[in-house]
């Protein structure tokens, strides 16, 4: 996106509440075994193609509530994407649990941040902000991640990033 001159506004949100509204009690990748097997194979292929370190997490999905609540206290500038990448690296490359304050603090440090967002998430909860982000995702008909919204049009899945960028160029 940066190479294409497209500005991205990161909006972390929780998928769990959106899945629950669809009647799912777990990730669809656990509920539907064939879909799950495909996901893990596809993640292996994509991360290899992109040169991203990846190992299947010991537990999936991991609880991302604390990571997401912490994200609500980070400015949407360049540090938020760095923090999100650090959280994903911890969970999907290093097999560390991003539900723990210790791991979140390390992710903040890797993004060049102090632990203030974590402290605010722990003290003030961040629940209202997190619920607002889920509501905003719901309003945009977002049902999975990653999702990209360009001028109100939804693109879902990493393989749709190119189409989303093309749409941004046209508009």
Kindly give the residue locations of the regions a language model identified.
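Structural alpha/beta surface segment adjacent to cysteine/selenocysteine redox centers
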Residues: 1-94
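C-terminal cap of thioredoxin/glutaredoxin-like
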Residues: 1-7, 11, 86-171
């Amino acid at each position: 996106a940066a190479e294409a001159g497209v500005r991205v506004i990161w909006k972390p949100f929780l998928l769990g509440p959106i899945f629950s509204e669809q009647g799912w009690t777990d990730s669809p990748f656990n509920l539907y075994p064939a879909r799950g097997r495909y996901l893990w194979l596809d993640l292996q292929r994509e991360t290899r193609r992109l040169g991203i370190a990846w190992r299947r997490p010991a537990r999936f999905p991991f609880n991302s509530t604390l990571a997401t609540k912490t994200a609500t206290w980070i400015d949407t500038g360049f540090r938020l994407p760095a923090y999100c990448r650090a959280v994903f690296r911890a969970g999907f490359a290093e097999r560390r649990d991003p539900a723990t304050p210790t791991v979140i603090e390390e992710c903040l440090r890797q993004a060049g941040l102090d632990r203030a967002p974590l402290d605010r998430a722990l003290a003030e909860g961040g629940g209202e902000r997190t619920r607002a982000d889920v509501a905003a995702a719901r309003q945009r008909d977002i049902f999975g991640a990653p999702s990209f919204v360009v001028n109100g049009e939804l693109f879902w899945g990493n393989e749709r990033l190119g189409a989303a960028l093309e749409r941004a160029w046209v508009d």
